[in-house]
Amino acid sequence: KRQSIKPAASVTLDKASLTLDKGKSSVISAKMGGGSGLTDFVSWKSSNSKIASVSNGKVTAKGVGRATITAYTTGGKNVKCTVTVKGKISDSSISAIKTQSYTGKAVSPAPAVTYGGKKLVKNTDYTVSYSKNTAIGQASVKITGKGLYKGTKTVNFNIRPATVTKLKVSSTGEKSVKLSWKKVTGADSYAIYRYD
């Protein structure tokens, strides 16, 4: 008796969505239903292979972003899986923070954050929080990933007393001078040097 060959009536995936860290991989399994399935097989395609490539259902995360993986049957059926690839903030580059001057208020420098040569956007790709930034000494800024970025990275910076300004010199005699200046917030002493 000759068997009637019919294409699969449907195809499903074991994952409707998938989140991967850049450089990682995972396998998506396809299952066909209905029909004989004797001549049906699944082919795979990525909407953006620079973000996520696929080979026989194995998805490899190539770059940060989103891509759609589609499984096609020879019978014309298809099903999709949305892949999100995330980058680690620990792999980002953060610009050095120069020494800051104490102001009596919170000192909050804004470092530039780049990932793979791309400048990230504050409050879209990451958020910042500060520690010990209201006093003279060492402070820190913590970068926390957001959206397509994950994890944290901390950078330290120094806060020093502001430079003395409005220095005035007046003579009080042949062997003495009087110095006056604007008070520096946070300074508890001043050093005066004499140069011959």
Predicted regions and their residues:
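Pro/Thr/Ser/Gly-rich low-complexity, intrinsically disordered linker/stalk tracts
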Residues: 160-186
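Glycine-centered loop/turn positions within well-structured domains
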Residues: 50, 67, 175, 188-190
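Extracellular low-complexity, O-glycosylation-prone stalks/linkers
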Residues: 184-196
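Extracytoplasmic soluble-region selector
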Residues: 1-91, 99-101, 105-138, 142-157
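N-terminal non-catalytic regions of secreted/periplasmic and cell-surface proteins
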Residues: 92-93, 177
